[in-house]
């Protein structure tokens, strides 16, 4: 199976609660670029997303290109959640190509758990693609990566 981990696009400054922060126009463009890449190169069959607004907005770019792919909100993939707990829930998802849209630092920690490597930060709207027989710590291999335009 393929697991595609995606960080949300650029979000507005912290002028509202973290869970309510919106994507900037630039962040929308980043999410669109990454969604185009995913749909062009992979065939996602299930989306999992954080409940936070900016992750939901990022997922919307994917859903506009793959409207028949089911999606579910997973409450424990917000920025400071425990990656072990999140991975335990993700392990129950039945999919051949799973896309998970979430945040730093949990996205880096999930990638680290999957491969057994040290955590590495994700750029805004970056995706990393992993292959594994099943979801379990240390069992995945990173196969691909895409980074859209960045603001710096």
What are these regions (language model features)?
Residues 118-141, 147-151:
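Domain-level recognition of soluble alpha/beta enzyme cores
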Residues 86-88:
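Conserved ATP-dependent adenylate/AMP-binding module captured primarily in the ANL superfamily
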Residues 82-84, 152:
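Short, solvent-exposed polar/charged micro-motifs at secondary-structure junctions
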Residues 3, 96-99, 127:
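Residue-level preference for the first positions of well-ordered beta-strands
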Residues 5, 73-75, 129, 144-147:
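Structural signal for conserved beta-strand scaffold positions within catalytic alpha/beta enzyme cores
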Residues 91-102, 142-152:
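A polyampholytic, Gly/Pro-enriched intrinsically disordered region
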Residues 95-115:
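A glycine-rich beta-strand to alpha-helix segment
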Residues 2-81, 93, 107, 117-122:
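Active-site-proximal alpha-helix that buttresses catalytic centers in soluble enzyme cores
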